[in-house]
C-alpha cells in the first residue's frame, strides 16, 4: 500500500465527499450525457469499423488491434496529449487444424462431437490422445445453481488414475486452476463443460494464463452431459481428444497518456483495448476504452485536474492481463508506489446491464472509499441505481488484478458479463431477470448492437466528473 496515502486524508475526504453530496438539477436526472458533451459511442463505432476492415476482430497481435491503438493514439494527440506506446511481447497459440473430440467405439453411445460444440482453450497444449474418461466432481444435480467448484481443489482428483482424461465443469475458479490440478493428478487431457446455468450453456472461449502441457477443450453443457453419462456407464468410456496448435511470441503495445506530471501521487485510469479473436469486442471492451478515451478528451479541454492522471489502454488483456502486468512490472518502484488509485473500466455497455462498482476491500484506502462514494453519489443524484461489490475478483480477472497484486488500491466499473441478472437486480436496474447481462460475451455477435449507448454515456459522465474533482496530492510529493 502506498505510504503517502494517510497524508492525503483531510483534503481528500472533504473534496470527494463534498462532490458526492452535491445537488443535481432536475434537468440532469436520468440523462446519459448531461453536460452537452460528445458521445462516447462514436469511439465504439470507430472501433467496430476497424474490426470490420481487419478480419472481424481486434485481438492483440493483429492488424485490427494495431489500427485500434493507432485510433486511440491519434485521438489523444489531437487533444494535445503526449502519447507513449509501450511495446511488449506475449505468448500466443493458434489452431493449425480444428480440434476433435470422439467418444470411442467401446463406449455405450459412440459419437464425434460437432465442431460447433467444442473449442480449444487459448494456451492449450497440443496433443492427440485416446484414454479413459473420468468425470471430476461435476455436481450436475445442482446444475441450475451457479458456483461449481469442479476441479478447483486437488482433492477433487482423489481416485483419478494417471493417464486418464478429466471432464470438469466451468465454475468459480480459473480454468488455470482446474488444468493445473488435472495435470498434477496425471491427466493427459482436460475437457471443460459449460456450467449449465442461464447464459452458460453454449461452447465458450477461454484462456489459460500459462501454457498447458496437455490438450484442453471446452464443450457445451449438452455435450458435457453426454460425456458424463458415458463416464458413469457400466462400459468404460474412452475418448479421443485432439488439439493442434502453433505457439510462439508476438509483439503488441499499450497506449499511455499522462495529464499532469507523475512526480507525486497520481491516479491511473484504464481499460483493455483488445478483443478476443472470435469477435470485434464492442462491449468487451471497446465500451471501456471509449469511456476512458472520452473522459481524457473532455478533460483536455478544461483546466488541469488537481491530481495528475494517467490514461491507459491495455493490450493483450484477453491473453492473460499481459499489457497491464507489463506496465506495472516495468515501473520503477518509486513510481509504482505513488499510484494513489487505479480505476478499471471493462464492459460498461452491457445490453442487460447493472451498474456495478467494485473495490478490493483489503486494498481499500481513503481515496478508494471516497471515490466509490463519489461515484455512488453521482448516480444517486440522478436516480440511477448502483450495486457495490467488495472483495471484487471478477472471477478470471481484469486489469485491476494486475494493480491489486502490486498493492495498488483499485476500483472497477462494470455492467455485467455472461452471468445471469437475478430478479432483485432486474427490479433495481430494469432489464430481464434470468438472462445474461451480456448475451454476446466473447462471441462474434459482440458488435455495436450489443452495446447500450445510454449506460455507456452514464458511466462516462460519472467517470469524467469524479476525475475532474480529484483532490490535489499532498505537498512535497
Give a label for each model feature.
Residues 11-22:
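Bacterial N-terminal signal peptides
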Residues 28-63, 88, 274, 347, ...:
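N-terminal capping segment at the start of a domain
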Residues 113, 262-264, 277, 304, ...:
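Metal-dependent peptidase/peptidase-like ectodomains
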